[in-house]
Amino acid sequence: LQLLLYPMIDNLHATESGQIDNHPVWNQATSFAAWEMYLNGEPGKDASCYAAAARADDLSLLPPAHICVGTEDLFYDEDVDYARRLNAAGVPCELVVLPGLYHAGDVFHPQARVSQRLMASVKLALAQALGVADS
């Protein structure tokens, strides 16, 4: 199971949501800095699909996925597209879109309903993957 919480999978940030540059937690500037450190160089250069999953051409051999992302997250568009591509490749993928949630908002506001929904979906996906979910 790919259990992905607002994953950072595209080093190019070429989407509309990838242009978010005014959020104090995670924005385009902090993300480019993270990619630069991770890729040991320029964040905008082509990256291996092993480093940036969005660069992969063939997703058909990947395991099932559970992806959670908020509508106010820098990674929203790339995560939704990754889920679409997984499904198109025949890989079971559940996409949980969380209205109003920004990147790591669940960490800052764990009691918020949207945060609790995120954690409930994660717990259920993990329980199902391990075969211990209540019927």
For the regions a language model picked out, list residue spans one by one.
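Alpha/beta-hydrolase superfamily serine-hydrolase fold, recognizing
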Residues: 1-135
